[in-house]
């Protein structure tokens, strides 16, 4: 998959800017706060109409602008595509693919990208939400219908949470509680199967990458966990649903007392161990960085296995934090597809990869 060129209008700090990319390695240089990450964010938008930094489209529109537009030519799945995404203050985002109007859900699955940025260290260091988000971002590109399931689950979760919060003042709300609980169990069963299947593939793909990355010193293992009554997260949807219903019944009183949803896919986690110990609790800074980057490189391999072509790989200010040996390891693994690398350095990385250099400064790209 390749981004051939992109034009930005009113996007973040860009009044108007355009860039053409090499099908191989592209090194995007510039000082801090010049818009390097904003450029990657625009490329990521092409995967499904969503940012990796914010849920609110209004934040993507530059200060003082009434709207923003991203226009790009991409090549994916053996065909050329033109994608146009328009954002307007107070309006729904509009998307066109090859001149045909699309929804964000319809855009998903037509182009894929894998991103690694400094915040991805939180996959290892933070709580379960960071790891669920990592899985959800990947699965949404692999399985386009998954995004709609996430949106439905979020809606149900918010409505049930409101019932649990307000039922003391309005007891009649409890009339609908069991129905929302059942719907959450049904959608959770679907989400859990998707996530567990992805976690299994990620475990297989990441282990050898991490072993090579760490020089054979460390062993990375991943395990998916959901609520206690689900014995097999890779079981049938029906089995998982019934197990969730059991958990829900056992925790109904606790939900009413606490005002919190205690059953469902929002309780899931991906356990990450290094040498048999929790990476979150015991990993060093270097081990954390190595593990997080291994997961992202494994994600890229999963996409390749699925689509028989590599997604665009975006490395945002990553290589500067690695020693020379680890830099070489990463650069040796990114062949075969298009890569966008941001850094504040000079063209040394480009010289090592034979890549194209783009410079971002003063709201422009050259």
Kindly give the residue locations of the regions a language model identified.
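Conserved NTPase motor "head" modules and their coupling/switch loops across ABC/AAA+ ATPases, GTPases
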Residues: 1-31, 171-312, 321-325, 329-332, ...
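Conserved lysine of the Walker
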Residues: 36
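Nucleotide-state sensing region of NTPase/ATPase domains
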Residues: 45-130, 136-146, 203-208, 240, ...
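Structural recognition of the conserved hydrophobic beta-strand(s) that form the central parallel beta-sheet
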Residues: 72, 338-345
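Long, charged N-terminal accessory/stalk domains
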Residues: 122-123, 129-185
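Short regulatory helix/loop adjacent to the ATP-binding pocket of P-loop NTPases
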Residues: 137, 347-360
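Walker B catalytic acidic pair
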Residues: 316-318
């Amino acid at each position: 998959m390749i981004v051939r060129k992109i034009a930005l209008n009113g996007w973040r700090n860009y009044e108007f800017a355009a860039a053409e990319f090499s099908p191989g390695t592209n090194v995007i240089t510039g000082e801090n706060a010049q818009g390097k990450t904003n450029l990657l964010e625009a490329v990521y938008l092409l995967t499904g109409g969503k940012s990796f930094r914010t849920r609110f489209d209004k934040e993507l529109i530059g200060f003082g602008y009434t709207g923003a537009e991203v226009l790009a030519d991409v090549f994916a799945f053996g065909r050329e595509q033109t994608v146009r995404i328009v954002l307007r203050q107070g309006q729904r985002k509009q998307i066109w693919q090859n001149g045909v109007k699309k929804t964000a859900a319809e855009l998903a699955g037509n182009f894929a990208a894998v991103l690694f940025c400094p915040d991805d260290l939180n996959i290892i260091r933070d709580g379960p939400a960071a790891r669920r988000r990592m899985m959800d971002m990947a699965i949404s590109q692999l399985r386009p219908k998954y995004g709609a399931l996430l949106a439905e689950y979020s809606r149900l979760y918010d409505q049930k949470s409101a019932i649990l919060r307000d039922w003391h003042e309005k007891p009649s709300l409890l009339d609908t509680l069991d129905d929302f609980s059942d719907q959450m169990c049904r959608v959770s069963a679907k989400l859990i199967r998707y996530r567990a299947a992805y976690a299994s593939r990620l475990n297989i793909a990441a282990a050898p990458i991490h072993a090579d990355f760490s020089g054979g010193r460390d062993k990375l293992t991943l395990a998916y966990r959901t609520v206690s009554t689900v014995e097999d997260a890779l079981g049938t949807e029906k089995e998982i649903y019934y197990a969730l219903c059991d958990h829900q019944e056992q925790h109904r009183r606790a939900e009413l007392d606490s005002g919190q949803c205690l059953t469902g896919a929002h309780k899931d986690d991906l356990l990450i161990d290094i040498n048999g110990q929790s990476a979150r609790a015991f990993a060093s800074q270097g081990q954390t960085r190595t593990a997080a980057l291994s997961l992202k490189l494994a994600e890229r391999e999963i996409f390749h296995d699925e689509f028989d072509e590599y997604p665009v790989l975006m490395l945002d200010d990553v290589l500067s934090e690695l020693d020379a040996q680890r830099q070489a390891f990463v650069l040796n693994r990114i062949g075969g597809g298009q890569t966008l690398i941001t850094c504040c350095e000079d063209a040394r990385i480009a010289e090592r990869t034979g890549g194209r250099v783009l410079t971002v400064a003063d709201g422009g790209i050259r």
